[in-house]
């Protein structure tokens, strides 16, 4: 298992790749290649980065459909950073079941604080907290009892 810091960096680089894809619509492989050459990538968990980037970009419509009911505007009206964070975290909530939902939400909040707008982290937290109650029913109810 990789270190917490390496996993955090993998999420940061995956976020950068998703953001690039949202703005440019470049191919996933081109983005993957570009991001993997950015300074500091050697300290990231490469396997997790690839899994997050590919898993998210291959399922954008399904992932957006999961969080869309919890936002009060159209998905395309979200800032690209918030949208990318929600896509990434939704993918993790659905597919990385070995990662606790609270870790996923906390990592998303930290990404929003670093890269998002002033209150973006509050928005991301609210959406993901509601989404987790649907995608991780047993885990969330066990944590709240």
From Swiss-Prot:
SUPFAM superfamilies: NusB-like. Gene3D superfamilies: NusB-like. Keywords: RNA-binding, Transcription, Transcription antitermination, Transcription regulation. GO terms for cellular component: cytosol. One of its GO terms (molecular function) is RNA binding. Involved in transcription antitermination. Required for transcription of ribosomal RNA (rRNA) genes. Binds specifically to the boxA antiterminator sequence of the ribosomal RNA (rrn) operons. InterPro entries: NusB-like_sf, NusB_fam, NusB_RsmB_TIM44. GO terms for biological process: DNA-templated transcription termination; transcription antitermination. Belongs to the NusB family. The gene is nusB. This is Transcription antitermination protein NusB. It holds the Pfam family NusB.
């Amino acid at each position: 298992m990789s270190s917490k810091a390496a996993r955090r960096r993998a999420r940061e680089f995956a976020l950068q790749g998703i953001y690039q894809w949202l703005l440019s619509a470049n191919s996933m492989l081109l983005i993957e290649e570009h991001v993997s050459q950015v300074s500091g990538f050697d300290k990231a968990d490469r396997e997790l980065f690839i899994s997050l980037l590919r898993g998210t970009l291959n399922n954008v419509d399904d992932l957006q459909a999961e969080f869309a009911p919890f936002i009060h505007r159209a998905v395309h009206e979200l800032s690209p950073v918030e949208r990318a964070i929600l896509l990434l975290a939704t993918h993790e909530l659905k597919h990385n079941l070995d990662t606790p939902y609270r870790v996923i939400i906390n990592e998303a909040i930290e990404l929003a604080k670093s890269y998002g707008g002033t209150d973006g982290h509050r928005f991301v937290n609210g959406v993901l907290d509601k989404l987790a109650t649907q995608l991780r029913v047993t885990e969330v109810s066990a944590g709240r009892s």
